[in-house]
């Protein structure tokens, strides 16, 4: 199956009134944009990660050619599998599982996806090098995934990848991405079976959000992290709990079912990558990370050129920022009977402490973004040392962690995060 099916589906979507172009994968939600679509002219990509293991952290790993910051499952002490990351050259990769690219008859289900991303971060500096890696390794790995990659040269592409083949979707190609944006959830356009896959509701929702933000010049890190990543709307049932009135009776609070929203009950982290402003400034490539469910945690910046990750984002076992977010999430999902864990208490999200959990989280995150923006302007004029970058990102992460602990002292003091 080639791009033929892609263009057929694209025509169907356009006829249905979709002015955006999207592709897909497994419960994660992803978006990618070329520099012509973003507010600052830098390529950008983002992933809400969904998985059954709530414990995520960052690690700084060394590769044969590049060192890199990586999102891993906390129990993976050696960092053998990576679920998103960026290296010191400014190359970043993310993915989402695409079961419809697997092969059940040959028992191929994408078990090599995470290890392959680790390989790519250690070896590749550009999108071109990643494509060459896919060619070199074809047939050697169990892959069933949608890889998203950007680089310091402005490249921004998705690769629908299976064991024996891949198809490239370039955000710079007007046939593929007429507005420079591509999004994905749980299915692949090059799948041989159009009825397999999932995440179609999130696919449509994130497409609408991106399509609305782009022409207004709002497609930036703040919009993606604070609006898209934390979105709780379900367009199919016309539900938007952040916009509707709260319950009048405190004994009957408003809840939202979060299995089909972008911010899901299974969302365990969010990562956003901003490419370099120019080819010679790869050191300014930035990785933002929210450890924990996006509505329960705040994003902090990481620069792989710093040569390390901030202490609150990592640890010998779990990461402090992730532990704190788990406690907040437990407060937002108070009913754990049966499948009731899928329901988020909107009243708590919007009213805790007089202003709500989300408002408190965003205030902490705004401070981190303001500090990062000022420092990047300074660094663009004069390249900093790795030590200076490391010290700064450490101070931002520590400030955010301490602020969150203060804001949610009551919650953290009484809640034990589920393991």
PLM feature spans:
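Secretory/export targeting leaders with adjacent low-complexity proregions
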Residues: 129-149, 155-157
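A short, structured loop/turn motif at beta-sheet edges
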Residues: 89, 121-127
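C-terminal, well-structured catalytic/ligand-binding subdomain of enzymes
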Residues: 29-79, 84-85, 95-122, 145, ...
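Sec/Tat signal peptide C-region and signal peptidase I cleavage site
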Residues: 21-27
């Amino acid at each position: 199956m080639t791009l033929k099916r892609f263009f057929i589906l694209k025509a169907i979507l356009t006829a249905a009134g979709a002015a955006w172009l999207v592709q897909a994968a497994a419960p994660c939600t992803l978006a990618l944009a070329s520099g012509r679509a973003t507010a600052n002219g830098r390529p950008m990509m983002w992933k809400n990660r969904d998985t059954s293991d709530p414990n995520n952290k960052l690690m700084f790993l060394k590769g044969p050619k590049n060192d890199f910051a990586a999102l891993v499952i906390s129990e993976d002490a050696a960092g053998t599998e990576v679920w998103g990351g960026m290296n010191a050259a400014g190359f970043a990769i993310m993915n989402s599982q695409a079961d419809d690219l697997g092969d059940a008859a040959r028992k191929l289900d994408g078990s090599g996806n995470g290890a392959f991303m680790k390989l790519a971060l250690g070896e590749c500096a550009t999108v071109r090098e990643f494509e060459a890696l896919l060619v070199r390794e074809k047939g050697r790995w169990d892959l069933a995934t949608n890889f998203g990659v950007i680089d310091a040269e402005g490249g921004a592409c998705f690769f629908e990848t299976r064991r024996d083949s891949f198809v490239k979707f370039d955000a710079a190609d007007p046939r593929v991405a007429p507005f420079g944006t591509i999004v994905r959830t749980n299915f692949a356009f090059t799948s041989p079976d159009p009825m397999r896959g999932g995440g179609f509701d999130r696919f449509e929702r994130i497409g609408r959000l991106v399509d609305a933000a782009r022409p207004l010049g709002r497609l930036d890190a703040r919009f993606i992290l604070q609006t898209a990543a934390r979105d709780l709307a379900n367009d199919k049932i016309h539900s938007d709990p952040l916009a509707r009135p709260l319950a009048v009776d405190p004994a009957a609070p408003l809840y939202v079912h979060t299995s089909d929203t972008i911010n899901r009950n299974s969302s365990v982290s969010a990562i956003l990558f901003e490419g370099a402003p120019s080819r010679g400034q790869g050191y300014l490539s930035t990785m933002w990370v929210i450890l924990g469910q996006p509505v329960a945690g705040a994003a902090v910046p990481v620069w792989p050129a710093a040569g390390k990750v901030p202490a609150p984002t990592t640890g010998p076992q779990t990461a402090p920022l992730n532990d704190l977010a788990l406690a907040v999430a437990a407060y937002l999902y108070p009913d754990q009977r049966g499948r009731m864990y899928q329901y988020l208490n909107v009243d708590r999200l919007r009213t805790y402490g007089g202003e709500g959990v989300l408002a408190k989280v965003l205030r902490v995150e705004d401070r981190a973004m303001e500090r990062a923006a000022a420092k990047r302007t300074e660094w663009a004029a004069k390249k900093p040392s790795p030590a200076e970058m490391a010290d700064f990102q450490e101070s931002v992460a520590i400030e955010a962690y301490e602020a969150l602990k203060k804001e949610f002292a009551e919650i953290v003091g009484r809640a034990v995060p589920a393991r």
